[in-house]
Each structure stands twice: as structure tokens, then as C-alpha cells.
Amino acid sequence: MATTRSAGGAATSVDTGPAAGNSGIRKLSTASVGGIAGGVAPSWQSCYYCTREHFKSISDFVNHLRNRHCTREGGSFVCRYGFNGVCASLPLDGVSDRDYDAHVAKYHVNQHTREMPPEWGVYSAAQNLPAVLNDPSRGKQSNLFTKKWGEHFVERSHVPPSPRLPDITHADFTVYLGSIGKRYRWHERRQQQLERDKPLENGAQGAPGPGTGGQTPTHLSSVPEIFLKSQLQLHHPATFKQVFPNYMQTSASSPESHQQTGRQLQEQLSHYLDMVEVKIAQQVSQKSAAFFHAMTTQHAILAEMEQAADQVRQLRAALAELHSHSVVDSFKVLRFAQRRQHYNLTLDKLRLMATVHKTQPMLQLLLGTQDYVAALDLIGTTQEILSAELLGIHCFKHLPMQLSEMEKLIDKMLTTEFERYAAADLNRPLTDALRETDSVCAEEDKLVAIVMGLLRKQNFSFVQAYQQEAIATIRAIIKQLLIEVLARSDSDQEISLTGHGEQALELTLPEWIALLQRSSQALVSILERIKTVVGIMQQTADAAVGAQDAVNLIDSEAFLSPGHHEQLKNQLQQLLQAVCHYCHERCANIVSPQSLERSSASEQELFQLSEIVDHFGETTRSICGVASVPLQLALKVQASRYAQRFHSERKQKLSLLLDQERWRQVDIPHEFQRIIERMAAGDYAKPEMGNLISNGAGNPVLLVEGKQPYTLVSASLMLIRMLYEYGCSAHRLPLLASYHARNVVDLLRCFNSRSCQLIIGAGAMRVAGLKTITSTNLALVSRALQLVLWLLPKLKEHFQAMSGYETIERDYQGHIKEIENKIHGIVSERLAAQLDAWEARPPIPSQTFRHISRHLVKLHEAIAGVLPEAQIHEIYGVVHRNFKDKLREQLLKLNVNNNGGPQHGVVTSELTFYMETLRTLKALPAEQLDNGILEEIWLY
């Protein structure tokens, strides 16, 4: 065992025995490591050269040094714990394993913690050289390179004191010194007292102890704690052993040794006693003044205590007298009053029990008068009394269960009564309902009582039950009406109604309409009855919730919460909507295509259906506030079928008329003139339908707006009549307007395409047997198309259609343009053929120009009575331009020049004859009929 002493005086022992020869870690004893350097942390708790390395024990630190800071060269160990891997105490030489452990324990484990000097860096300088040289606030300095580097390299500037820091004087500490001075003086006195006590304690340390040759301290800390306890029980073996240690432990010891040991023990105990007496003497000497003062005042204290005892005896006697005369009698009065109160409470309990005992007879009486709300309130109040005030009463232990069963019975009774009432009210004959004036609902008071009871129980299922009963009633009414219709019908079919029953019957269309009308009337009566019942339910709910504007139907307080009231209100509204929707569905089955698939409704019958459906829809909307769709959809299906049939008939008829059309002008009957006038005015209310007479009395032209004449063919007249029929049908039945609008577009498209095929495509020569397509035929078609173009804005406004009419208008305009091109193309080709054979020589006018004049006259005769003057001028203008172009080509071919020669004179004479013909026909505007052509013809 090698023993060393550290700089702080702490003894450190290192075990270097043979048992630690091969162990990697030696046991290091640090008895007083915690006191090194006045509380500084030991050096083994962290490594100087490894970051984030901290150790909880010396063995961990030693293992770290051996693993990280030690190298082994052969059989020796070299310590590397130091800067740059060199140990300051063992720099180069290697040592054995045991010596390495001793070196670590001596120089690295037990050395004091010293802070390593910081390494010098660029920030350790007094001045930052780059910052000084690059200071932007200072210009170039002449003595920059002659100055010596140091703390005076940069001139110091005076920093004034901060205005935010106040001046501190001695007066600022006056309050603090006054508050702390008293405690400080008390502290000084205590310090002086302790300094005076220390010499006394140090002077008593020279007394010899028993069995020892040295000095033993006299402080109480040297006295064992066993002697300082309040109770010293020597009969306990443990206590006896502590008081007499090592006494009679060996049986071989002699009597002299026992005596010697006893004397030593006696001397030690005597020494302990002396120490305690000395300490007591010190305490008595310190407190002697207080002790003598207490002894002197003891007699005075005894006298005061005797006087106080006499006063206590007198007070007790007075209290006893007061208790016997005042308190006892008062308590008797209070006891009697409390007993009277208890008697009254008991009497009240008995009266309450008597009242509760009469609950069941009272319930039977209330149920007999159908006052369900009062009965339920009585049950609820009785249950509250039983649970709060009569809890534990033995005679009423079964009453709560009986009341609960009775409450369930009332709930079931209310449900049954409501279902019975709903069935009786809904199944009343409809004739009785029609005679009711004040209210459709019968026995309103009974209904209010039942509904109020159901609301008191918060049983809202009665709404669903009433809805199911209403639907069943509606179904029964429809079946009954079907049976009655079949009974009146002449058909021999077997009556078998299953399910809805309407779809499997074969009835005529008037019978279906009559059935729908009777059904709608009956359903309206039922719906009015249902609406009245729902209104009474709503009024009852308003009264139950305590609404301000509600009718007072109950005598008790409001018991329905606002949330439940809103829920019931929504359920009642949904009931009306569901019943109305079901009525529409059943009526829609009557109007469905499956029911009417063998019948084709006429316009009058469809009008009747529309009136019935609209009236029924408005009535149901006024009842439930929501429009129902099924019946309207069924009516639209029938309207679509009628519109499709209506359109198919007229489209087929128009196609036949176009195929048979001879494309000749016909007289316009007066009825068609009136039709055009009504269509121009938008009046489709009174249709005029007469027989179409081609050669009867009438005007030769159709006057539009009183001044525009239209020459038409019979097919165009029939088209006008059809368009008027479409407008009248849409005016009478607005439901058909959307269908007719599309069908009118289709009809006009059919007329346009078919007339184009027959006239421009020459289909009329094959279908109608025409020999040729003349200009008159083309002009008549063009005029018919122009009449349709005039009618298009009126039709669009009447049908309120937004799509399709623009396309038709473009198609018609293009067709008219094609007809014009066809007309002037025919004439231009004939004029060009004549000019090809013409030569500029006499006679004048030549035969060629005579033929040209004849063609112009024929064209004018063909189109003058059909087309308007502006269109005639446009056609002749195109023919005139083509004539001039062809004549220029011929003049160039004949090499005729504007030189005043004979050929030039011939050309002038021919053109004069040509222009005279145009003037006679008035085929061009007046400004184009001058002799300007005589100069224009030579302008190439």
C-alpha cells in the first residue's frame, strides 16, 4: 500500500498489491476528494481534450485514459494525456502496467482542477487590426505605417455618462440602512458572544480521559448519544452493551483485569459527568440573571394565581346560576316550539299521504273526461312527491311502479285513441266534408286533448301514424273511384284491382279524364281536411310551447321545449308535403302513358287535362307550400305525345302538298289574309279555319302589313295555316309552347329543304310532272321563302324560343340567294350565247340584239308579278353586268375600237336599242338607265 498526500492535504491510498497485478482498473481511495480546493470539481469528472466527455466515477475516467489517451509499445505503456498527445509528467518513457496505474492516480486523478489557459487567437488582441485599417469613418492617415501596434494604436475617445443612469448618493441608501441596522447590530452582539464562549471551550480540553494517554475534548459531541436520551433503560441488552462496551467479553481474563476495566469505565463515565456539569455551569452562568429574576418573581406569580383561581370559582358559580334560571327555561321553550313544528310537519305529511292516496281515483276521473294532460301532470307531480317528500314510506313502496305502469297505459291509450280518431275523421263521407262551414275537422276538442296528451308524453310518432292513415285513405278513395268508373263503363272486362290498379284498366279517354277530375276533387277535399287537422295540431303545439300569439288551449304551464316544438313543426310540414306528393303520384298514374297508351288525346281533351292538373297543383301548393312534380311530369309526357302527333300529321301533310305542288300562283282567300293579319298582331286567340279554295273568290296577292304584296302558291298558304295552328295551340296550351317551338323550326326546315330539292334540284319535274323549271316557279318559291322570313320574328316572339330560329333564317336567306343566282344565271347564259354569234355590222338592230331584248322581256314577264321591284332591280343589275362583261370580250375578239369608225357606230346603235328595252321594262333603277353604257363599254 503506497500512501501519498495531495496538495490540499487529502490522503490518497493506491492499492499496489499483487492482487491487482492483471486488473485493468486499480482501486483508488479518495477520502477527501470532495474538499479539494474549497469545493472545486475534481479533475476526473471531465476530460480536457475530449469534448462532451463526462464521468460519474474514477474508474470510468481511468478506463477512458487507458482507451483513448494511452499507447502500448511492446510491454510498456506510454501516457498521451496532454497537449498534442504528450503527457507533461511522463512525456517519453514507457512504464509497466502497475506503474502506469500509479502515474494516472497521482498526476491525473488526484490533481486539482485547473482551468486551461485559453489559446491565443485573432480575437485575443487588444485591437482588431482589419477593423482599424478598414474603418470607413476615417480617411487616409499619414502616420499609419509609423505607429507602433498596441492599445494606443487607435486614439481613445471620451464616452460621456449615460443620461439614462441617475447619480447615486449616500442618501439613496438611508432607508435601507435604517431597516437593516437593527438586525446588523443584533448580529454583531451574537458574534461577540460566540467569541467569548470559544476560550471557555478550548480551555476545558486538557482533562485526561480514562484509559487514554492523550487529551480528550470536553465538548458534548464527545459524549455518546445514549447518555443524552431522556430515558436510559439499562435492562435492554442493546443499551447495556453500548453503556458497557467490551465488559466481561472474555472468560479467561483475571479478576485484576476486570477491576482495571471497571475503574477505567468508571473514570470515563465520571469524565462524561464532569463535561455535562461544566456545560450546565456555563449555561447557568449565561442565564444567571434571568434565573434570579424568575426566582424573585415566583412569589408574585403564586399570589396572582390564587387570585385568578378565586375569580374562576366565582365565575363558575355565576354561570351555574345563569344556566339554571335562563338557559334551561329558554331551551324548554325552544324544545316545545320545535316539537310543535315537528307535529305540524307530521300532519302535513299525513295530509299529503291522504292526497297521494286519492291519486288513482282522480286519474280515473281525469281519463274519463279525456283530460290527458292533467292526468299526466298528476302522475308526474305524484312521482316527484314520492321521490322527494314521501321517500321511505312503507305503504307507498309499490305506488311509483303502479304510476309508471299507468303512465305507459295512458301513452298506449293516447296512441290508440289518435289512430281511431284519425281513421274515423279521414274516412268520413266526402259529402259531409263539403257541408262543413266552420271547420272541416270534426270533434276538435277531442283531437286537441289527444294531441296535447301525446305532446305531454313527447310522443311525436303520431305524426307518422297520421301520415300513414292519410295515405291509406287516399289509396282507398282512388280505388273506390276506379270501381265506380268501371261500374259505369260499357266494357265487359273483369274488375280486378291490385296494388295501384290504375295501370291495368282499359278505359276511354273521356273516362280517364272524368276519373282524374273526380279523383282530384276528392283528393282536394281530403287534403283540406288533413290541412285542418294539421293546423289544429300546430295550434296545440304552439299552446304547449307557450307561444305569445298561440291560442290558450291548456290550463297548465307550457311543457314543450322550443327544440321539440321546431321538430314537430317540421314534421307536420313534411306530412303535408308527403301527402300532397303521394296524391300527385296517384294522379300521375292515371295520366301516365301506360294508362292512356291506347288513347290519343285531342287538343280539347289535353286542355281539360291541363286545367285539372293546374287547378290540382295550385290547390296542393296552397296546402303544403311546395309544388309537386309527378303529375306535372305525367301531363308533360301527354303534351309531348300530343305535340309529336300534331307535328307528324302536319309535317306529313306538308310533304304531300309539296310533292303535288304545281308551283303556280293561286288567289289568296280572305281567311288567309285574316290569318296573316292576326299573326302580324300576335293574336292567336280566335283561329279561323276554312277550306282552302285555290280558284275561289279572293285577292290575287297576299298583303302583308297592308302594303307589301306576296304572290304565293298553295303549299305556302298551307304552311301559313299550319304555322297559325301551331301558334293557336301554344296560346291555348302554354304547356305545348316549348314542343311547338322546336316543331315549328323542324317544319320550316322541312319546307325549305324540300322546296329546294323540288325547284333548284328539279325534283318537281319528276314528282309533279313539270316539263321544266321556269323563272316564274323560282320566283314563287323565293317569294314564299321571303314570307317565311317575315314571319320568323313574330313566331320567335310568340313561342319565346331562343335557339334554332337564327339557323333557319340563315338557311332561308341562302336559299333565296341561290334562287336569284339561278334566275339571272339562266338569262345570262342565254345572252352570252347570243353575243357569241354577234358581229358589228348592219342591219341595226341586229337579230342578236332583238333576241336579247326578247329574253329580257320574257324574264320581266315571268318575275314582275311575283317579286318585289327591289329584287327585280337586283336580278337585272346582275344580268346587266354580265352582259357588259360578255360584250367587252366580244368587242376585243372582233377588234372593234372606240375610234369613231363604222363598227363603233354599229355598237353605239345596238347599245342604244338595248338600253331602250331596259327603259321600257324599268328593269333597273332610274339612275342606271342613262346612256352611260356607251362610254363604260369601252373601259377595259
From Swiss-Prot:
<dbReference type="GO" id="GO:0000138">
    <property type="term" value="C:Golgi trans cisterna"/>
</dbReference>
<dbReference type="GO" id="GO:0006896">
    <property type="term" value="P:Golgi to vacuole transport"/>
</dbReference>
<comment type="similarity">
    <text>Belongs to the VPS54 family.</text>
</comment>
<keyword id="KW-0221">Differentiation</keyword>
<dbReference type="InterPro" id="IPR012501">
    <property type="entry name" value="Vps54_C"/>
</dbReference>
<comment type="function">
    <text>May be involved in retrograde transport from early and late endosomes to late Golgi. Required during spermatogenesis for sperm individualization.</text>
</comment>
<protein>
    <recommendedName>
        <fullName>Vacuolar protein sorting-associated protein 54</fullName>
    </recommendedName>
</protein>
<feature type="region of interest" description="Disordered">
    <location>
        <begin position="192"/>
        <end position="218"/>
    </location>
</feature>
<dbReference type="GO" id="GO:0015031">
    <property type="term" value="P:protein transport"/>
</dbReference>
<keyword id="KW-0813">Transport</keyword>
<dbReference type="GO" id="GO:0001675">
    <property type="term" value="P:acrosome assembly"/>
</dbReference>
<keyword id="KW-0653">Protein transport</keyword>
<dbReference type="GO" id="GO:0007291">
    <property type="term" value="P:sperm individualization"/>
</dbReference>
<keyword id="KW-0175">Coiled coil</keyword>
<dbReference type="Pfam" id="PF07928">
    <property type="entry name" value="Vps54"/>
</dbReference>
<dbReference type="GO" id="GO:0007290">
    <property type="term" value="P:spermatid nucleus elongation"/>
</dbReference>
<dbReference type="GO" id="GO:0005829">
    <property type="term" value="C:cytosol"/>
</dbReference>
<dbReference type="Pfam" id="PF10475">
    <property type="entry name" value="Vps54_N"/>
</dbReference>
<dbReference type="GO" id="GO:0042147">
    <property type="term" value="P:retrograde transport, endosome to Golgi"/>
</dbReference>
<keyword id="KW-0744">Spermatogenesis</keyword>
<dbReference type="GO" id="GO:0005794">
    <property type="term" value="C:Golgi apparatus"/>
</dbReference>
<feature type="coiled-coil region">
    <location>
        <begin position="299"/>
        <end position="325"/>
    </location>
</feature>
<dbReference type="InterPro" id="IPR039745">
    <property type="entry name" value="Vps54"/>
</dbReference>
<keyword id="KW-0333">Golgi apparatus</keyword>
<dbReference type="GO" id="GO:0019905">
    <property type="term" value="F:syntaxin binding"/>
</dbReference>
<keyword id="KW-0217">Developmental protein</keyword>
<dbReference type="GO" id="GO:0032456">
    <property type="term" value="P:endocytic recycling"/>
</dbReference>
<feature type="modified residue" description="Phosphothreonine">
    <location>
        <position position="30"/>
    </location>
</feature>
<dbReference type="InterPro" id="IPR019515">
    <property type="entry name" value="VPS54_N"/>
</dbReference>
<dbReference type="GO" id="GO:0000938">
    <property type="term" value="C:GARP complex"/>
</dbReference>
<keyword id="KW-0597">Phosphoprotein</keyword>
